[in-house]
Design a protein with these regions (language model features):
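Non-transmembrane, aqueous-exposed alpha-helical and coiled segments at domain scale
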Residues: 1-179
């Protein structure tokens, strides 16, 4: 089966979401393979404007499978908010949206670390969105992040959360002088 890959090379804002939306009627699935909700894509269907941050824009095409892959970092609260907004507007998610169990979660402590790190850098700050994407990828690379599938196993989730909270609270207080 042939594949079409849309890749941006300018750190965002190149129109990947719009291009993906144009290609969507010609494919079986749209897969988001990396990134977080710090980015967004706006798609206009008819006279309706949709702004998506986590969910692939293919979701606006009925019956098209859309996948949030294992390379994506997901803010659960933001994802639920985005899903609810789509459902309110009549977009069907059941059977159309799939989320990898191996996708890592953006937790509140990731956002706190993102903001504390920026504050500590002062004039050298990088201009992060403060949504915790970078720190979530740090945990993914360090193999200590919490994944979507961990939400399905409460004892595992609680164990990972406790370990992460101990480490993140120490990092915030001792390195960043934050709470």
């Amino acid at each position: 089966m042939p594949n079409i890959v849309v890749v941006g090379c300018q750190w965002g804002d190149e129109g990947k979401g719009k291009v993906t939306d144009l290609l969507a009627p010609h494919v079986d699935a749209v897969v988001r393979y990396q990134g977080g909700n710090n980015a967004g894509h706006t798609v206009v269907v008819g006279r309706e404007k949709f702004v998506l941050h986590s969910i692939p824009s293919g979701i606006l095409h009925p019956g098209l499978r859309c996948v949030i892959g294992c390379g994506v970092v997901v803010d659960p609260a933001a994802l639920i908010e985005e899903m609810e907004a789509l459902v309110r507007r009549g977009i069907v998610l059941d059977g159309n949206l799939y989320i990898s169990r191996n996708a890592h979660l953006i937790m509140p402590y990731h956002r706190a670390l993102d903001l504390a790190s920026e504050a500590k850098l002062g004039d050298r700050r990088i201009g992060t969105t403060g949504k915790g994407v970078g720190p979530a990828y740090v945990d993914k690379a360090a193999r200590m992040g919490i994944r979507m599938g961990d939400l399905l196993d409460e004892p595992v989730f609680r164990e990972k959360l406790a370990a992460n909270l101990r480490q993140k609270n120490r990092l915030l207080s001792e390195i960043y002088d934050a709470q």
